[in-house]
Amino acid sequence: VPFAKLGKKQRHQISLVPQDFAFYPLLTVWENLKFFASLYDVRDKGYLLELLAKVDLTSHKNKLAKHLSGGLKRRLNFAIGLINRPIVIFLDEITVGIDPQSRQFILDSVAALKEQGVTVIYTSHYLQEIEQLCDKLVLLNEGNLIYQGSVQGILEEEQSLERFYLDFLNQAGNTC
């Protein structure tokens, strides 16, 4: 079913955290959360405060978003994606360009979402993250599907996803 044909309730159960920041840099962290909450008709201030704590931004609540570090901006982007309590969330390159501590924080948060039963669709070029987080995998090369199946299936035959992908590229005559 095309997204546009879903009802409002179904659309509000799906969330996207894009690679590019999707917040307003001239608003504070708190103002951004309140604005995006209003789009989903979320009025529970307590929930927004919990969300701030969940992404470890409580102490940055009153900072302008543009003054946050890259890792904190990723956390704000992630928090905005969680405002609507999605049952399906698309995470596009969510750990690109951030420090190791923020990266691990986000990976742990994504793992917690999975444990809560949220369906996570995770795009990444970091194959180690995929090994760590994902059950199923779709690999694309230049827009073409090259693998669809379980991560475990690849790991049983190969040493790593990197080895699988590099072997595929070599067989196809591509080089890195």
Identify what each model region corresponds to.
Residues 130-132:
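A short, surface-exposed alpha-helical micro-motif characterized by mixed small hydrophobic
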Residues 148-149:
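ABC ATPase "signature
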Residues 64-71:
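Conserved ABC ATPase signature
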Residues 89-92:
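Catalytic Walker B motif of ABC-type/P-loop ATPase nucleotide-binding domains
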Residues 34, 38, 43-60:
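Conserved ABC ATPase "signature" region
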